């Protein structure tokens, strides 16, 4: 999968599926400095992905500050050819100072054994 470099950040697209409903995010940050994957709550509601009564809620912290998120298993996360099932994601408001549809973190990249080729700007299988 091609990686787009914009404003000195790496961007990809991602698709998530929950109970047969699928949504695609076009502006997803590829972030090896993020331990987890996070998607915006207002978009996840489009596929009825909301917190369960016992979904863990906690604060994550990044460059933009702290943000409350909930964690829940999603049926499928896909980034290009990389696909993982029954994967734990984080969902939060994601109100940042720049347009962003989500973050693919190190947990996903390690789980699918992805390699980032910065010379060719590609996400590839190892």
What does each of the following model-derived ranges do?
Residues 1-126:
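Pepsin/retropepsin-fold aspartyl endopeptidases
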């Amino acid at each position: 999968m091609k990686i787009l470099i914009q404003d000195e950040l790496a961007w990809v697209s991602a698709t998530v599926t929950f109970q047969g409903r699928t949504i695609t995010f076009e502006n997803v940050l590829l972030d090896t400095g993020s331990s987890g994957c996070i998607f915006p709550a207002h978009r996840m509601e489009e596929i009825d992905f909301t917190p369960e009564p016992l979904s863990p809620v906690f604060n994550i912290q990044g460059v933009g500050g702290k943000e409350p998120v909930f964690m829940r298993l999603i049926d499928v996360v896909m980034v290009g050819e990389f696909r993982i099932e029954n994967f734990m994601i984080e969902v939060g408001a994601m109100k940042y100072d720049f347009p962003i549809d989500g973050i693919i973190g190190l947990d996903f990249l390690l789980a699918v054994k992805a390699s980032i080729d910065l010379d060719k700007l590609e996400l590839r299988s190892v």
